[in-house]
Amino acid sequence: MMETIRNYLSYAGIQYRNPDKSGDEREKMLELRHKGQEARKAFTNLAKTFQASHLEWQLQQTSQWMNQAQRLRPHFWAYLQREGQVTEPMLALRLYGKPSDFGISLEVSFIERKKDEQTLDKQAKVLELPVVEGIYYLVYSNGESHKVEATEENRLLLREKVRNQEIRKILVKS
């Protein structure tokens, strides 16, 4: 399963075209589609395995293997919803990295295109919880993201920055 996902990551960013309209590259496009579909299936199976141990969470659809520009995605994700609306924060299993250094993160996140006026405030409530071992914060501000160590001092600093709207969103990852 993980080998299929690792192999797919080396194709991230490649432009995909309909094989029937690709001329000499038809076989290459068929192979890319096969690699993408197999990797997505493997990631979906991984997410199902996780969800089977956490029955209170409902698995949502896995992201597609290519984006709207028809480039092979550099990652996959699957949301797990516990209760409430799709505007509520959820858990997300997310593939990240490159073939030589990749992993799966579990994070408190939300579906960006389905957020409402309260979503970011609700999601920032993760900063009201005490720090636990094995987590870190992924902070988004000014269109950039960066990793912040999960310490009590950083948690309090990030809470203040969220209040002052210096930070757009923050994810808790492990």
Predicted feature residues:
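Compact, glycine/acidic-enriched structural inserts
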Residues: 34, 100-166
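N-terminal domain-onset segments
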Residues: 1-61
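Polar/charged alpha-helical tracts
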Residues: 7-10, 31, 48, 78, ...
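Short glycine-rich, low-complexity/disordered patches
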Residues: 45-65, 132-148
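Amphipathic, interaction-prone secondary-structure segments
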Residues: 57-95
